[in-house]
Amino acid sequence: MKLKMIPIALAALITATAATAPVGASVFHAWEVTNVSWGDLLNVRRWPASYSQKQSAYPNGTVLSLTGRCKGGLMLDDIAHLPDWQKRQAVRYKWCEVWHDPANNGQWKTGWVYMKYMRPN
């Protein structure tokens, strides 16, 4: 009798877990700020344009969480299987979306970085 209950309990657990997962959940991609000129910082912008409002700035070596969405329809998931040098070539002149905490106060938001200054981590 107990053995018959295990599949039912397992099915109920899977259903409950799936129901609580966030809709549109995504995997973040870790990329590192690199090749920014000495004494300079990489700006995170509100929109994907150099004239857009600056949200924050990060020095070389900072690892940022990218959402995977880039301008031009490129998704980082689509290039995840490539070697790092090919990933960098694919995004070199694109803006990609980041998830960051610009004020270090727990209020996370999205912003955009120019990928010329980023490398896979």
What does each model-found stretch correspond to?
Residues 19-26:
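Sec/Tat signal peptide C-region and signal peptidase I cleavage site
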Residues 30-37, 65-69, 76, 83-84:
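A structural signal for short, hydrophobic beta-strand segments that form beta-sheets
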Residues 26-31, 47, 53, 82-121:
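Boundary regions of SH3-family modules and the immediately adjacent low-complexity/disordered segments
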Residues 9-17:
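Bacterial N-terminal signal peptides
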Residues 47-69, 74-75:
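SH3/SH3-like (including bacterial SH3b) beta-barrel domains
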Residues 39-49:
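Short, structured beta-strand/loop micro-motifs enriched in basic residues and often containing a Trp
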Residues 1-9:
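Bacterial N-terminal signal peptides that target proteins for export
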